[in-house]
Structures are given as C-alpha cells and as structure tokens.
C-alpha cells in the first residue's frame, strides 16, 4: 500500500469474514490539514486479500483504539512524517541500512516476483493502472532467477524434467 492509502484506512475497510482490506481513499496533508481524497489512480481502488496472521494483528491493534466505530481511522493523528520518524528510530536501533516507508512497498512487490506471482496479479495488489509499471519497476531480472532458469533448462536437457 502507498502511505496515503494506509493513513486513510478505516475500521470499516477491514472485512475479517472475507479476509480482505478495501483501499478506496488516500490521505494527504495540505497546509497542515488532513485531506481525504480518492487514491492515486482509478485502479488504485482495490480489495486486497490479507492472511490470517495479519488479520489477527489488525484485530489486536483495533482493540487498543479508543471508542472504535466503523469510520474510525486506524492511524488517526499519524502522518507520513510520523512513520518516517519511527522507521528512522527502528533503523538506528537495529543497525540495518536506511530504508524508507516506500521501500517496504517495493520489498513486498519484489518478494511477490521472487515467489513467482505474475505481474498481472502483483499489479492488481499494488493498484497499478498498467502492468508495464509493475514490470518495469519490480520485475527486473536477477542473477538468482537467471541461474534457476539455466538449472531448469539443464534438467530438461538431461531428461530429469519434462519442461512442461
């Protein structure tokens, strides 16, 4: 998710029965005021399936909120700067290299590529309007993938795999 989409999430956007999260708004800050708008593009409006462990974490988090209603924003009062500051704090404590909030989105997409999901599936999950955006940004060739291709072709050549 984009940071603005995350900041705009409301309790009603989480469907625990279906295991989904609906992205249909984005939050931006203009002249010190929070402004809820439509997401970046029309294709950014989407429903994301989330795994059980994440659902449980979200339930636990919601239980910590005060006076929860369907329209309660999950991260009310938080800003992009807040998340950036918390990331910076975590980076210093852990000693890892500097990463940004957007790096998490990029890492998620790259992991999905490595797991073998198609660019079309990944584009839908990320809310990209064009699959080419996903391909150009996240589907760059890795040496690891190239080695796997060569290994598999070798197995086909040796008759260890059918290739089908």
Label the predicted regions.
Residues 8, 16, 136, 140, ...:
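Phosphate-coordinating loops and pocket residues in cytosolic domains that bind phosphorylated ligands
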Residues 1-5, 86-89, 93, 103-130, ...:
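C-terminal catalytic core of tyrosine-transesterase DNA break-rejoin enzymes
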Residues 19-21, 46, 72-73, 136:
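Extracytoplasmic/periplasmic beta-strand context in beta-sandwich domains
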Residues 18, 31-33, 37-45, 49-54, ...:
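C-terminal secondary-structure termini that scaffold catalytic or DNA-interacting sites
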Residues 35-45, 74-79, 95-103, 140-141:
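Short, contiguous acidic/charged loop-to-helix segments that flank catalytic cores in large enzymes
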């Amino acid at each position: 998710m984009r940071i603005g989409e995350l900041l705009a999430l409301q309790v009603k956007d989480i469907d625990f029965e279906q295991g989904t999260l609906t992205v249909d708004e984005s939050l931006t800050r203009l002249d010190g005021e929070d402004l809820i708008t439509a997401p970046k593009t029309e294709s950014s409006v989407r429903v994301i399936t989330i795994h059980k462990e994440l659902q449980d974490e979200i339930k636990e988090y919601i239980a910590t909120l005060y006076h929860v209603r369907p329209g309660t924003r999950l991260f009310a009062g938080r800003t992009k700067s807040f998340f950036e500051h918390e990331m910076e704090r975590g980076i210093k404590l852990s000693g890892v290299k500097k990463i940004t909030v957007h790096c998490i989105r990029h890492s998620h997409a790259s992991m999905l590529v490595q797991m073998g999901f198609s660019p079309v599936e990944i584009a839908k999950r990320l809310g990209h309007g064009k699959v080419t955006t996903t391909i150009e940004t996240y589907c760059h060739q890795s040496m690891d993938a190239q080695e796997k291709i060569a290994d598999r072709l070798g197995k086909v050549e040796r008759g260890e795999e059918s290739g089908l």
